[in-house]
Amino acid sequence: MTDGHTTKSGYMSESGRVTGSCHCGRVTLSVPHAPLWAASCNCSLCARTGWLVVYYPDAQVEVTGETVAYIWDDRMIGIHHCPVCGCGTHWQTLREDFGKMGVYARLLDRFDVGAVEVRLMDNRE
């Protein structure tokens, strides 16, 4: 922490949580701590969007604001985005409890990709 409120890779609220939002600010996210690593996935969707995903237990992620879910053929996860600005915000499982959800790291305030390990995930269909 540098000034009691920031870390190298995110804004830390008074509660110690890291916050972020979509581009227009209508969807906000709060996670328990700054990410230590992020996943760079090569699935058909992530390869097109360039998302970096950080994972947290479902119960530790707070999402406020209305989102729209995109669900494709395998129907395993819902990819959520803001209906106003279109920013992808997070994904949640639909069929089974993975015990985690994915949050798009670049939405976290002051996220610095150079401050975290980026792990390549091979999920190409």
Spans of model-derived segments:
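A short Gly-Trp-Pro
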Residues: T2-S21, R26-E125
